[in-house]
């Protein structure tokens, strides 16, 4: 049996917020209006029914009630005594701060645990988050081992973790190794946790306003040592960088340095605020930093070959247009024996979970309306359409080599439906603007971009939303280089804009 809610605003089932039970094998549609249902995880009903049952189980039979629900617990071997109910492993970017914050909130808010503690594990880069579940006599522990993204997939393959955390996509060979657990690239197993972005900052007196990605790499690897070499005012470049254990450094290394080493003369900092202040006080300084720490320094716009420079901000990172942005992932078996896996992932992707993502210094996927100005080189029709409109903080993108929406887009569709549902708004003023890469003939790319926008329009209408305009702009306004597969994939997108935003804002 599956459960879902209707989000067709003209349907009384949706208006009442009724949860619809759908037998397995039946179409997942509203029985009243026929619209697709938005899936409701079973965990959403636990506090009202199932958790009460488990509390009674625990009260009479000890921990066995929880064991029945979540699988046999494992005793911890760390400094936190108790039984392990969930294991995460992988990325240090996720595991150092965000992972523990999500685990702590999950224990408190979803499992109603008391006396929740966050403690270092017995091994470096490991954390134990524990609490007392209702009716239980011993502590329940969520363990997080943050030893790098590769260990997420190794841990899943070896059965050493329940959820793999990664700051990159699963590689083809890793997916093949894990095929017994399901298709790791499929919707059931690949979950976008949040977005990460890094700003390149200079002194406010530095006249330089933009850099290409390759120039940033040359600067921080020491291949370029004077500002004049990148079009700036002559003067020696002073490098400031975060320490090796920083998630910000991990992101920068993956997106910029790659196999190149950071120049040995770089001044390293453990504190982002201190690094930002150092650049702000050095006329020749340059550094990289998380978005919240730009402060008195100046962020420069970043460009890839053939694409316009973009400044780092919440919108450009949320839409993934900014070159130094990346997705953070959770990977799970298609059918995990641990019944806490799905509830944890659902919580992490929920509005409450995404608020925690934002509080941890990353960019959440909660939808926002943002003021945006069309670039000067945009097509005249594009500028006219988006004038006085607001842009929604997401782009819809597609699976590599296919016309299907990717896994993030599928979740974003539900976020979009909820966003407009909360406003009691049917999307009459929504603009869907499609784009393509530049491979092949322009006329074909114009049609492809329109087809992508129509695909999103179809999904909107299945959810009771009625966009007023669907248009394609072909290869215009690339946000990434068309010389690479990743760049072309980024350029194949659909933007969402909203006319009459003042009317919507008034309803909030």
Where are these regions (language model features)?
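Flanking scaffold residues of small Cys/His-coordinated metal-binding clusters
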Residues: 1-6, 24-25
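Short Cys/His-rich Zn2+-coordinating modules
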Residues: 5-18
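Membrane-anchoring helices that localize proteins to membranes
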Residues: 42-73
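Flexible loop/hinge segments at secondary-structure junctions
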Residues: 63-402, 407-411, 488-490, 503-508
């Amino acid at each position: 049996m599956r459960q879902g809610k209707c989000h067709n605003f003209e349907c009384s089932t949706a208006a009442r917020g009724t949860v619809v039970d759908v037998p397995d094998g039946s179409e997942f549609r509203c029985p009243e209006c026929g619209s697709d249902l938005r899936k409701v995880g079973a965990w959403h009903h636990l506090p009202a029914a199932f958790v009460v049952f488990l509390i009674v189980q625990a009260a009479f039979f000890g921990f066995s009630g929880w064991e029945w629900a979540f699988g046999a617990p494992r005793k911890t071997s760390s400094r936190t005594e108790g039984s392990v109910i969930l294991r995460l492993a992988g990325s240090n970017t996720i595991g150092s701060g965000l992972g523990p914050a999500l685990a702590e909130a999950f224990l408190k808010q979803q499992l109603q645990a008391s006396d929740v503690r966050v403690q270092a594990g017995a091994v470096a880069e490991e954390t134990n988050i524990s609490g007392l579940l209702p009716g239980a006599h011993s502590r329940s522990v969520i363990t997080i081992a943050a030893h790098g993204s590769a260990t997420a997939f190794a841990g899943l393959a070896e059965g050493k973790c329940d959820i793999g955390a990664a700051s990159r996509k699963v590689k083809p060979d890793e997916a093949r190794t894990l095929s017994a657990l399901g298709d790791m690239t499929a919707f059931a197993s690949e979950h976008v946790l949040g977005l990460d972005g890094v700003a390149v900052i200079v002194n406010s007196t530095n006249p330089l306003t933009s850099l290409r990605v390759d120039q940033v790499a040359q600067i921080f690897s020491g291949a370029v040592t004077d500002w004049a070499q990148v079009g700036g005012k002559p003067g020696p470049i002073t490098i400031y960088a975060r320490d090796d254990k920083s998630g910000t450094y991990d992101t920068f290394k993956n997106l910029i340095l790659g196999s190149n080493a950071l120049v040995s003369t770089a001044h390293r900092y453990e504190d982002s605020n201190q690094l930002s202040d150092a650049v702000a006080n050095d006329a020749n300084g340059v550094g990289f930093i998380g978005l919240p720490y730009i402060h008195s320094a100046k962020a420069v716009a970043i460009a890839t070959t053939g694409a316009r420079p973009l400044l780092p901000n919440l919108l450009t990172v949320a839409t993934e247009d900014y070159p130094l942005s990346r997705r953070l992932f959770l990977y799970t078996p298609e059918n995990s024996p641990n019944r806490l896996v799905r509830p944890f992932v659902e919580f992490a992707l929920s509005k409450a979970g995404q608020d925690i993502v934002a509080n941890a210094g990353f960019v959440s996927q909660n939808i926002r309306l943002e003021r945006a100005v069309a670039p000067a080189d945009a097509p005249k029709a594009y500028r006219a359409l988006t004038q006085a409109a607001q842009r929604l903080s997401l782009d819809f993108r597609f699976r590599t080599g296919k016309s299907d929406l990717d896994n993030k887009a599928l979740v974003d569709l539900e976020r979009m439906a909820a966003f407009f549902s909360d406003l009691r708004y049917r999307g009459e003023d929504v603009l869907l603007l499609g784009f393509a890469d530049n491979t092949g003939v322009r006329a074909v790319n114009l049609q492809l971009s329109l087809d992508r926008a129509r695909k999103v329009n179809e999904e909107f209408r299945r959810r009771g939303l009625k966009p007023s305009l669907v248009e394609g702009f072909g290869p215009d306004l690339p946000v990434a280089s068309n010389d690479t597969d990743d760049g072309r994939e980024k350029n194949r997108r659909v933007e969402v804009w909203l006319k009459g935003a003042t009317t919507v804002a008034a309803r909030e």
